[in-house]
């Protein structure tokens, strides 16, 4: 069980870092993401996909922290100590 938890943790860490690095590469135009509006190239070229990637990464870390905190509170609650 502990081995799968460690591998899932590394998978989560590498995925988040990949999304962060890809988002930064998109901001600085190292990666071009075509965004088309009515068949034309949008004047705001890769702004929205970049913001979406970075925002989702931050929201995911906040969600992960609060889930971890909830599990800690549940594990260390007095009712869990009696088991």
Swiss-Prot record:
Pfam families associated with the record: PIG-Y (PF15159)
Cellular component annotations (GO), alphabetically ordered: glycosylphosphatidylinositol-N-acetylglucosaminyltransferase (GPI-GnT) complex
Name of this protein: Uncharacterized protein C227.19c
Gene Ontology process terms (BP): GPI anchor biosynthetic process
InterPro entries recorded: PIG-Y
